[in-house]
Regions:
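Acyl-donor-binding surface of acyltransferase catalytic domains
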Residues: 1-12, 173-179
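A conserved beta-strand-loop-helix scaffold within acyl/acetyltransferase catalytic domains
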Residues: 7-117
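Active-site/acyl-donor-binding loops of N-acyltransferases
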Residues: 60-63, 67, 73-100, 113-179
């Protein structure tokens, strides 16, 4: 899919995705600079996070929007393994890994937990390109439902969810209390 000079970068293998991790970490840091709760990820942290996420990630659920050779935005999706974690009682050993692997393959839910667009490309429809491409992937695969985790104060993303016909059924808030 290409619109207004933007194209989608998809991944077929974890090896292919691994090569993009440093660029994705850099983009992630640039995208969230304006968020008050954000702490930049170092290169070493990015490598560790990337390795851990690759253990559960399906490369087809990681989407990048490209403007030429530059990354303009991203959307990450992960199979929902929460049922496997419940069945394993939160323990991997001795047999918890079985439930995690089983549910990773059998789940009908996908968690969309990580989306960002660089400031110069916001308001140009990049989010619509990402959502449309992810919807195609979800509908062509074994998934039936998607869960977008978003803070209540991120009004634009919540509006995007409503526009796409999504239903807001959870509120994620941060409370502060001085001790």
């Amino acid at each position: 899919m290409e619109r207004r000079g933007f194209s989608i970068k998809t991944f077929e293998s974890k090896k292919e995705l691994t090569a993009w991790i440093p660029a994705i970490v850099e983009l992630y840091n640039e995208t969230f600079l304006e968020n008050w709760e954000f702490n930049p990820i170092t290169e070493a942290e990015g490598k560790v996070i990337g390795e851990r996420l690759l253990s559960i990630a399906d490369p087809k659920l990681i989407k990048l929007v490209m403007k030429g050779d530059a990354i303009a935005g991203f959307l990450f999706g992960f199979p929902d393994i929460s049922e496997g974690i419940r069945r394993a009682n939160g323990r991997i050993w001795p047999f918890g890994w079985f439930w995690l692997l089983r549910d990773m393959k059998k789940t009908r839910w996908i968690n969309l937990n990580g989306a960002g667009i660089l400031a110069p490309y916001r308001g140009l429809g990049v989010n619509a390109i990402l959502y449309a491409e992810m919807e195609k992937t979800i509908r062509s695969g074994a998934f039936e439902h998607a869960d977008l985790v978003q803070m209540e104060e991120h009004v634009l993303t919540l509006e995007d969810t409503k526009t796409m016909g999504g239903q807001i059924y959870k509120r994620h808030r941060i409370y502060e209390r001085h001790l």
